Amino acid sequence: DALENVKIQSGRITGVTDNDSEQTVTLSPALSTTSYSVMLTPVIPTGGIGTNAPIIGIKSGSKTITEFIISIQNNGTTPNIDEIEWLVIKP
């Protein structure tokens, strides 16, 4: 059955810093290929965020079978995004 072959991993990155940064997500166990989808959800602080919303995405060329890199740009200063939830689905 095809559904039995679907692999899902999830987690949360904490301690995202102000301004520009990169966070590496380690996949364990490793996936069989780099053909997987990543969903990122920034966790908004209780008081909201500043006037400039940060840009959050996957760093180009960073997806491997064991990791990928989240790039955070323009994160501003407090309050800012300090956590990101991630979900990986490999069909």
PLM features: residue spans?
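Extracellular receptor-binding modules and their adjoining Ser/Thr/Gly/Asp/Asn-rich linkers
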Residues: 1-37, 42-48, 54-91
